[in-house]
Amino acid sequence: MDVLKITGGIPLKGQVKAAGAKNAMTKLLVASLLSDKKCTFYNVPNIGDVEVTVSLCQEIGMEVRWDRAAGIMEVITKELKTSYIPQRFSGSNRIPILMIGALLGRTDQDIIVPTAGGCPIGQRPVDFHIQALEQLGAVIEYRGMKREGAYFAHAHNGLKGTLITLPYPSVGATENTILAGITARGVTVIKNAAIEPEIVELILFLQKLGAIITIDVDRTIRIQGTRRFYEVEHTVIPDRIEAASWGMAAISSKGKVFVEGAQHLNMITFLNKLREVGGGFDVRSNGIEFFYDGPLQGGLHLETDVHPGFMTDWQQPFVVLLTQSSGTSVVHETVYENRFGYTDTLKEMGADITPFRQCLGGKSCRFASQSFSHSAIIKGATPLVGKEIRIPDLRAGFAYIMAALIANDTSTISGLPFIQRGYENFIGKLADLGANVSLVEEEKNVKEMPENSSKLPLFAELQVN
């Protein structure tokens, strides 16, 4: 498998464009399965998770035309070929479980969905999904199969709207409940719902599709069921995770990068924390410029939370930033229980990070009585040294890229498909920003990145009709 070599110490400088949001586009594809109308998407990210989701949707009957260069995709699902999701998708991402909510109103057949996958960052149970769907009238059973297992679901008596209070504002459970509520009879009310920008994006798309749906400031979503749908054109919001990632990479490398498409509204909490450590940024009409504005100051307490709190996917690269900040900082992860495994590699590179099982620096969270390392103390600033790194998951992957960019000497990074799941053309963008990067193929030939690498492919082309 190919590996990436990065020689650190070069400030990133230039401009990149934030691609369409992974966590929006993948869910919009699933939502389009609710109807038999054509949906046209713009600003579609050319990333691995969209590839997998397209392949999954095609498996059950979606027709797809994807102009990757233009970022335009047309989809239509005139009829379902099957309601069985093959087990090869079980470890791909978290999308398969959302098929239950989307397909319950589209078929009378059993919907068979393999065990959920995604990044190995915690247990990420789907109990909240199942409980909410059952309240709407779905019958769901888990059965062991040859390799893993699958959920069997149906709504032979139809779905009926009701009041659902989620135990925790889970993004996935909120999405699944919304999708099922669209075709349920009557009104569905979801309390304690997630209100992430990607949830709002889903709601905007569904309203265009024909839904009558509202969202209130108290985390309440109301849906009037319908089966009357329309053709839709929709532009996907820029990815706030990618935008923040490039911003942190710019500042930690003592550089200056303008991120086209970065949206101020969806990054308020992140920008506040960035300013607290001394990171510079300039909000413009078409994006945000991030720049090194002098030595970074730690002494920060950071707690991840559901929106509008500090996003859990910003946590790993921000920890790398804190390793370059003077003083002692505390990070408390409250969304996923097992998201500090990546720090072992950072410590081997020279970082001073100590994970703890206790809730440090703030409120107690739902992991307080469990034996998970979900807090960390980071002491900086510490120099980092290059090493061989194996990427374990998507967001830790970018944290390792950041660490390699600021490390002394050269790092060799494997597991690149994890980053390709969520970052469009990240190697080309690194090269365009001046990073010293080279891709080493299996036969050990080295490909130096040309000056203008913005068109370099990330992965093998998926055949999409």
From Swiss-Prot:
Reactions that this protein is recorded to catalyse: phosphoenolpyruvate + UDP-N-acetyl-alpha-D-glucosamine = UDP-N-acetyl-3-O-(1-carboxyvinyl)-alpha-D-glucosamine + phosphate
Keyword Transferase among record annotations: yes
Key words of the record: Cell cycle, Cell division, Cell shape, Cell wall biogenesis/degradation, Cytoplasm, Peptidoglycan synthesis, Pyruvate, Transferase
Secretion signal span: none
Gene Ontology cellular-component annotations: cytoplasm
UniProt binding sites for phosphoenolpyruvate: K22, N23
Enzyme category, top tier: transferase
Annotated UDP-N-acetyl-alpha-D-glucosamine binding sites: R94, D313, V335
UniProt keyword annotation of Transferase present: yes
Active site: C119 (proton donor)
Residues modified as 2-(S-cysteinyl)pyruvic acid O-phosphothioketal: C119
Subcellular location: Cytoplasm
Disulfide bonds: none
Listed EC numbers: 2.5.1.7
Biochemical pathway: Cell wall biogenesis; peptidoglycan biosynthesis
GO MF, one annotated term: UDP-N-acetylglucosamine 1-carboxyvinyltransferase activity
UniProt-listed GO biological process terms: cell division; cell wall organization; peptidoglycan biosynthetic process; regulation of cell shape; UDP-N-acetylgalactosamine biosynthetic process
Family: Belongs to the EPSP synthase family. MurA subfamily.
Summary of the function given for this chain in its UniProt record: Cell wall formation. Adds enolpyruvyl to UDP-N-acetylglucosamine.
Protein name, as recorded: UDP-N-acetylglucosamine 1-carboxyvinyltransferase
Species of the source: Protochlamydia amoebophila (strain UWE25)
Source lineage: Bacteria, Pseudomonadati, Chlamydiota, Chlamydiia, Parachlamydiales
